[in-house]
A protein has these predicted regions:
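Ligand-binding pockets and gating/stacking loops
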Residues: 1-412
């Protein structure tokens, strides 16, 4: 039962609570985002290496981002950008899994590790502690948008129970949260609603005053409507507009020009703003680890190249991620939520003959915001062509350590 679950979780944590109460949002740019056109434009390099669209100034003296990140540039003093992140793997599946796991020996993604240590559900709200937000989670209109969650949500050697909760799958968990019943069971539905109404009146009249702490908590979870977290309709329209990426469209003729053009419509970033808003809501309600996916970053030129992909995906990430940072600050959550922006690897320093860049594991995209970390800094630097780290190498294990120290109060 739910009261038993809550009591068990509390007992397990008595005297040994190592949780910091913070959350992590991992924005995973699937396909391998170019490190050059994002956070390391290298405009002093030869033309075939430097950022294709130039650079934009930031609030940090002498630091520039790629030209499609002007909003993030204005928030650079609230970010920590890494220009020396390297793991050496240039294969999609294994590199994505490596980054998602932070190289830990169980090969479980960091969200699963968190759930293993913190529990499957938040002890107070009942919300899953490890949640995946793909475009389809934002509604049926986004069901055809691409996502490859299997690469970044492996439980490795841990039990499958620690798999990320995916609200887009129509799982029984979300249905239970929403108290749905199949069509045709009207009498059962009416009976259930009547019983819930009676239960609410009973609670309102103080009838649960004598219940155990965990029975009361269970009442609050059921009657409080945990599923409301997944409904954006009560959000301030001004913030909805600030996050919104629905206006960013793929040019109609672009897919026909490409060898693998049929894949391009699935890369639309129109849901990304809503995904990031959902991530904030989840963290605000107690979810400890949220993974947000955004695809299309494999910019060889067969589908998207850097030349035609960055003008679409870049502004979407810029708007959604900057809105997330500003929203967290407005709500007093900046110290409580760590945003991590990364992908499976970077892209080749030299632009290819299709207007794209190919796989490159020797330098990768990585940036942070919030979480109580030191912001307003650039960590490490790349060499003159953004081919490899030139100082302060950052590894997968360091990424894992940063995330785990944010989530847990543990020694080095």
């Amino acid at each position: 039962t739910l009261p038993h679950l809550l009591a068990t979780r509390a007992a397990a944590g008595e005297g040994s609570n190592i949780l910091t109460g913070k959350s992590v949002v991992m924005l995973n740019l699937q396909g391998g985002p170019t490190h050059i056109e994002t956070f390391d434009p290298k405009m002093t390099a030869p033309s075939e290496y430097r950022a294709m669209f130039g650079e934009t100034k930031t609030t940090l003296p002498g630091v520039t981002f790629g030209s499609h990140f002007p909003m993030l540039g204005k928030l650079a003093h609230k970010m920590a950008v890494v220009r020396s992140f390297k793991h050496g793997n240039g294969s999609h599946g294994s590199a994505a899994a490596l980054v998602a796991a932070g190289g830990n020996p169980t090969k479980a993604c960091m969200g699963s590790l968190y759930a293993r240590l913190a529990g499957l559900n938040n002890a107070e709200t009942g919300l899953p502690n490890n949640t995946l937000v793909v475009p389809a989670a934002m509604g049926k209109r986004y069901k055809d948008l691409n996502a490859v969650p299997s690469r970044i949500t492996s439980t490795g050697d841990l039990p499958k129970a620690y798999q990320a909760f995916d609200p887009s799958t129509g799982s029984n968990i979300l249905n239970d949260m929403q108290l749905n019943l199949p069509d045709g069971r009207f009498e059962d539905r009416r009976g259930l609603l009547q019983r819930l109404d009676e239960l609410k009146r009973y609670a309102d009249n103080g009838g649960i005053a004598g219940a155990s702490e965990f029975e009361q908590q269970a009442f609050e979870v059921i009657l409080g409507g945990v599923s409301k977290v997944f409904d954006l309709s009560d959000e301030d329209p001004r913030w909805m507009e600030r996050y919104d990426t629905g206006h960013i469209k793929i040019p109609k003729g672009l897919p026909k020009k490409k060898k693998n053009g049929k894949a391009i419509p699935g890369f639309s970033p129109e849901a990304l703003g809503k995904q990031m808003m959902m991530a904030r809501r989840l963290c605000e309600s107690g979810c400890g680890f949220v993974t947000v996916t955004n695809t299309g970053w494999d910019m060889h030129g067969n589908a998207f190249g850097v030349d035609d992909g960055m003008p679409i995906l870049g502004p979407a990430v810029d708007k959604a991620a900057s809105a997330f940072i500003e929203d967290c600050e407005a709500r007093g959550l900046s110290e409580k939520i760590l945003l991590v922006i990364t992908g499976e690897f970077g892209r080749t320093p030299r632009i290819n003959n299709k207007g794209g860049r190919d796989h490159w594991g020797r330098l990768c995209t990585l940036a942070f915001a919030g979480g109580g970390l030191k912001m307003g800094q650039v960590i490490g630097r790349s060499d003159k062509t953004a081919s490899s780290p030139a100082s302060d190498l950052v590894t997968n294990n360091m990424l894992l350590g940063t995330v785990m120290h944010t989530l847990f109060d543990i020694p080095n």
